[in-house]
Amino acid sequence: MNDPSNAREVPRRQFVALSGAVGAAALLAGAGPLGGAASAADPAHAESPADSCPTSPPGAGPSPCPPAQFQPLCGKPTDKDPLWNDVQFCVHGTVPPPPQLKPNCLKMSADYIILHGMPETRHNYLLVPTCRITGIECPFLETSGAANYWNDAWQNARSGGSVPVQYPNIGLGINSALSRQLQQLHIHMAGVRPSTQARLQDLEKMSRIATQLSHWGSPQYQAAITGAEGSGDRTYRVLKLPDLGQNLFTLLYRYVVNPAGLDMARQTLIVVPKMTAAGFAGSFYVLSSDDSLHDGTTTCDHLLVYR
């Protein structure tokens, strides 16, 4: 069931926080979306003022956290979302309130932690910021101060990474505010089906993948891609990048969301490293979608493989 959203005078969607009645990872296992969202006015996308006082990230890492003026959209450090409780345990040792269980902290850094997803497999992990950030709608993610969480996820998930995704093809993904179940940003590190990889490479051969950022939102680079058996096709905007050195949240807003007058809170974003029989081919397919597209989707779950 979707929670109703509370309307407030904020530049973007105001989320309704979930209460942590069970372990955070357990909430990610097979349930429908629990968080509701509403369309809102244009967000504030300016860089944080130099004299603002960002909340220091737990662990005092090099990347700042969202300043106080972003808290209505990005969350407060005092929030009790289950996944944020997991961060507090991994970083500070703060035990989650019962009946939530202690998480298994697979990796910790100044900017993020990595946890098991649910179900717990060798190709289902979550990268979670140590900053309090609700999700993709947080405008701070689009600023130069934010950590590059997508590249961090890839560096861990790749073969030889600290928490490698053991699956022939890897996918990284984030759900929209409409479709996620927990109100703390998390990037799924999982598998993708061979058919997804093959479809993307076929689209590339047909020149149906944007290779310039300015073309990412163009209808000619929208393509239907089949997900799980029986789930049907979904439409995605497909871009190819040589690396993940740029902030994907910034690129998504600048080249897709803002030009079309869309809502960042309704976007899903997926990264599929190009793979061949020899391994990683040195580039990435970046897919975006939302419910403004015909047969679009607000979730990455159609393409990612968790079980």
Q: Could you describe each region identified by the protein language model?
A:
Residues M1-Q14, L18-G32, A37:
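N-terminal secretory signal peptides
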Residues M1-S5, A41, A50, I174:
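Intrinsic-disorder/low-complexity regions
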Residues E9, A31-G61:
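C-terminal segment of N-terminal export signals and the immediately downstream linker at the start
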